[in-house]
From Swiss-Prot:
Signal peptide: 1-16
Function per UniProt: It is likely that the major role of L-chain is to prevent the retention of H-chain in ER by forming the disulfide linkage.
Record's protein name: Fibroin light chain
Post-translational modification remark: Partially N-terminally processed to yield a short form which lacks the first two residues of the long form.
Protein localization: Secreted
Gene Ontology CC annotations of this record: extracellular region
Transmembrane segments: none
Tissues where this protein is expressed: Produced exclusively in the posterior (PSG) section of silk glands, which are essentially modified salivary glands.
Originating species: Galleria mellonella (Greater wax moth)
Gene, per the UniProt record: FIBL
Residues found modified as N-acetylserine: S19
Cysteine pairs bridged by disulfides in the record: C103-C162
Length: 267
């Protein structure tokens, strides 16, 4: 049974340093989220994240998870697409015992920032295609994790060949553009997401860096036409994970759909 830990910060006065009280309870005592009748909801995102081990999940990753829950419950399609795309991206980074790198994420972030500045989308199309392939790899990892939680404990995440393992990219420029394009339903949540992702980007450990890059890249890709094409397949995978269904079958179908989308990216 998984523990649920509540951290309570208490300050006895305005000038006093806060004290910390930790209460541990069984997660089974916490009421699960209830679906809202739509295919995409906070219940879907929340249950999908239950497959990953919480040992490497720091407070900023938990913050991201709650933001994704809130985005999934928004009434607009872009917020829901963002929640699903970023959930798959983050779950892939949390699936393996040893972090990989974020070369594809860094490439799509840099290409997006450059395209906003220059108006040239040619490099962005290639980068989006490569990142969709990375999402396909993430789906494979999610499928393995759902089938056997111990199967990836000693495995490493995807490796690539890029400077610094994809830990350095145009973070601020990309998020400036993402925030400028946010709609009224999501602007507050996107700003919260930016703040949490920034802490992950500046963290010393590669797991946090990878999740920060995944969330940032997901925010970029979710705005493209390709995201709408792959969205149903991503939802099917998360639904199978959440329901304890045939994740392998959903992952196989999603892999084909993502391969087709990657081969036909249009911006």
């Amino acid at each position: 049974m998984l523990p649920f830990v509540l951290v309570l910060l208490v300050a006895t006065s305005a000038l006093a340093a806060p004290s910390v009280v930790i209460s541990q309870d069984n997660i089974n005592n916490i009421a699960p989220r209830v679906g809202n009748g739509r295919p995409i909801s906070s219940a879907l995102i929340d249950r999908a994240f239950e497959i990953v081990d919480g040992g490497d999940t720091n407070i900023y990753i938990l913050t991201i998870q709650q933001i994704l829950n809130d985005l999934a419950d928004q009434p607009d399609g872009l917020s829901q697409s963002l929640a699903v795309t970023q959930a798959v991206a983050a779950l892939g980074e949390l699936a393996t015992g040893v972090p990989g790198n974020s070369c594809e994420a860094a490439a799509v972030i840099d290409a997006y920032a450059n395209s906003v500045r220059t108006g040239d989308n040619s490099a962005l199309s290639i980068a989006v295609a490569n990142y969709i392939n990375r999402l396909s790899s993430n789906i494979g990892l999610i499928s393995q994790l759902a089938s056997n939680p111990d199967s990836l404990r000693y495995s490493s995440g995807p490796a690539g060949n890029c400077a610094g393992g994809g830990r350095s990219y145009q973070f601020e420029a990309a998020w400036d553009a993402v925030l400028n394009n946010a709609n009224p339903y999501q602007i507050g949540l996107i700003n919260e997401e930016y703040c949490a992702a920034r802490r992950l980007y500046n963290a010393f450990n590669s797991r946090s860096n990878n999740v920060g890059a995944a969330i940032t890249a997901g925010a970029v890709v979710a705005q493209t036409q390709a995201a709408q094409i792959i969205l149903p397949s991503l939802v099917n995978v998360l639904s199978a994970v959440a329901a304890g269904g045939n994740v392998a079958g959903a992952a196989a179908q999603a892999g084909q759909a993502l391969a087709n989308a990657a081969a036909n990216v249009q911006l």
